[in-house]
Structure formats: structure tokens, C-alpha cells
């Protein structure tokens, strides 16, 4: 919940999260159903949407459990399902037809034809593959019948999202089952080289300097990867992207804060600008924590607002009589005047 609060308090319009099963970050501290209810209430009172990630491949023997997950989440009021498995798309439409379906980046949709096919299946938003250059994103946005979302900040896979089998082959932990062991972040040696090189580790993506261009393309939503990051990271990155998206120019202080809170020897825009190569690679370096930056980030979500409570108002009006106004919250507390 701290990371969720950090996102909301720093300007997120929507948050995406997962339950303990059926999501691509099963190693994270995911939400229970009770915590999901708390998250939905917290976000909806503040005008923020909750998107539930069910973004792995699901086997036949798991479909009953997945169906129950979809049903309960819909009852709790989630605003969208983020889905990879085509079978789950049909299941979501059957069980919760009023909840929008977003095609996960794990679907590897990288062309207009893929977007059109997803739209035919009933998907209302497509999260494009991270590897697309700006020209192809713009072309898809101009011709897409559904909303387009792209990742603008966070970790990049060495392989195309949803198409990597390295973790499964090396450690029997499939990335398409939410269990990626991140072997691309490990050192590898070969020949006369010692095992001190990281030939598969990409720097994190950072497109903060391109936000106005991305908006002009018609991208409906920008996405920040942060589900296994500290709340302070979520706070800092969300705050900066919100400010720039609202029209403030990017500053050197912004770029410094983004790099300080987490980076892998800087950032890359290689896929977006179409300049792939050796400059995209880097590793995370342990550096002393910036105490002022971390303290400010924590304060933004720990002391960012007065508590809010969702309430319902009732008016009782009778001709020739006094009027009554009643208010009640979702826990049964109320007042009348």
C-alpha cells in the first residue's frame, strides 16, 4: 500500500497492481483480496483508477481459480484487467463484461495489425511492446481504433516482452509465469574474459524528455514500471513525470533525481529514438543513499494529505415540510441535518 499511496499522492491517474497469483511479478509483495478492496476504495475516493494485472499465461487446470479471481476483482470494483493470455480475454468478457480489458505488453503487440486483432477480441487498450520506435508508435496511434499505452520509464527486457525463455531454460522459472529470475542482470564470462561482464543487462528506459511529443502522437496513457521498486522510487518518478506532463519543462535537477533514485549507469532512449547498440547496456551501481531525496519522497505520501472518506448523500424533500439531508460512509457512519 505504501507504493500505491506514493503513486496516488504524486499525481498518478491510475495504478496497476497484482494479486498473489496470475501476475508477472509473483515475487513482489502483491495484494490480498482484502488489500485490493482497501486499494480500490483509497483510489476511487481520490479519482484514481485501479488496473489489475492478470498478465501471465494460464493453464487449463488453473482456469477455475483464474475465473474466481476475475469475478472477485470485478465485484471489488477494479477499473480494468491487464491480460496476456488470449483465453483470459474471453474469460474476462464472459465473467465481467463491463470491466475494460487492456492487452498487456506481454502480448508482444508491435504492429497495427496486432492492435486491430486485439480490438476485434474486445480489448479497449493496447500496451505496445517496449521495443517500438517513435515512428511506428505514431503510425499505430493514428490508425488504431482503441487506446494506446506505452511504457516511458523503467526496466527493459533484453528480449521482446513476453518472448523471453532464458529464465525458464536456465533456472526453470518462466517469465511468462511471473517467475523471471532476471538472468539478463547476471555476469557472464566467455573465452579469456572473466565473469565480470554484463552483456545482457540493459539500462532502464527514460522518456521524460519526450512526453510532449508522445502526447501529440495520441498516446492515451504513459506507464511507469515500478511494482518491485521502493515507495520512494515510485514517489520521485511519478512526481517528475506528472509535473512534466502538466507542462513544466524538464530540468537538470529532474534528470539527476531520476538517476539518483535508481538507474543502471544512466538511462536509455535507444528503442524509442531508433538508436540501438552498445550504449543501451549498463548495470546498477551501489551508491550512497541521498537522504534528502528519500526523506522528501517519503513525506510526499506519508504526510501528503488529510484523510479522505467516500460518502453518500441522501436528500429527503416533502412539500410543505422541512428538508432533511443525510450523509453516510461505506462503514455505516452517518449524520443527518
What annotation goes with each model-predicted range?
Residues 5-9, 14-21, 40, 46-56, ...:
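Surface-exposed amphipathic alpha-helical tracts and adjacent flexible/coil segments at the periphery
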Residues 90-93:
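Short active-site loop/helix that positions an aromatic residue
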Residues 96-98:
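Conserved phosphotransfer cores of two-component systems
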Amino acid at each position: 500500500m505504501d507504493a500505491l499511496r506514493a503513486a496516488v499522492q504524486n499525481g498518478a491517474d491510475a495504478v496497476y497492481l497484482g494479486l498473489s497469483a496470475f501476475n508477472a511479478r509473483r515475487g513482489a509483495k502483491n495484494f490480498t483480496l482484502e488489500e485490493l478492496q482497501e486499494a480500490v476504495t483509497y483510489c476511487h475516493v481520490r479519482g484514481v483508477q485501479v488496473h489489475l494485472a492478470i498478465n501471465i499465461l494460464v493453464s487449463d487446470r488453473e482456469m477455475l481459480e483464474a475465473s474466481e479471481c476475475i469475478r472477485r476483482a470485478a465485484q471489488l470494483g477494479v477499473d480494468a484487467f491487464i491480460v496476456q493470455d488470449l483465453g483470459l480475454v474471453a474469460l474476462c468478457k464472459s465473467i465481467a463484461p463491463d470491466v475494460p480489458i487492456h492487452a498487456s505488453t506481454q502480448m508482444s503487440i508491435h504492429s497495427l495489425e496486432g492492435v486491430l486483432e486485439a480490438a476485434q477480441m474486445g480489448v479497449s487498450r493496447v500496451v505496445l511492446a517496449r521495443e517500438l520506435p517513435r515512428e511506428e508508435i505514431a503510425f499505430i496511434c493514428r490508425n488504431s481504433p482503441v487506446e494506446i499505452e506505452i511504457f516511458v520509464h523503467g526496466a527493459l527486457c533484453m528480449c521482446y516482452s513476453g518472448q523471453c525463455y532464458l529464465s525458464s531454460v536456465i533456472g526453470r522459472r518462466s517469465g511468462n509465469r511471473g517467475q523471471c529470475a532476471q538472468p539478463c542482470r547476471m555476469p557472464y564470462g566467455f573465452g579469456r574474459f572473466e565473469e565480470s561482464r554484463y552483456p545482457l543487462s540493459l539500462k532502464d528506459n527514460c522518456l521524460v524528455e519526450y512526453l510532449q511529443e508522445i502526447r501529440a502522437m495520441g498516446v492515451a496513457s504513459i506507464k511507469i514500471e515500478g511494482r518491485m521498486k521502493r515507495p520512494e522510487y515510485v514517489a520521485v518518478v511519478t512526481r517528475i513525470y506528472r509535473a512534466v506532463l502538466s507542462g513544466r519543462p524538464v530540468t537538470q535537477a529532474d534528470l539527476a533525481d531520476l538517476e539518483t533514485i535508481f538507474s543502471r549507469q544512466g538511462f536509455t532512449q535507444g528503442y524509442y529514438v531508433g538508436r540501438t547498440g552498445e550504449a543501451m547496456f549498463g548495470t546498477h551501481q551501489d551508491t550512497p543513499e541521498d537522504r534528502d531525496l528519500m526523506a522528501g519522497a517519503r513525506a510526499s505520501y506519508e504526510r501528503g494529505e488529510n484523510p479522505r472518506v467516500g460518502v453518500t448523500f441522501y436528500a429527503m424533500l416533502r412539500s410543505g415540510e422541512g428538508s432533511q439531508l443525510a450523509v453516510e460512509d461505506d462503514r455505516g457512519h452517518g449524520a443527518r441535518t
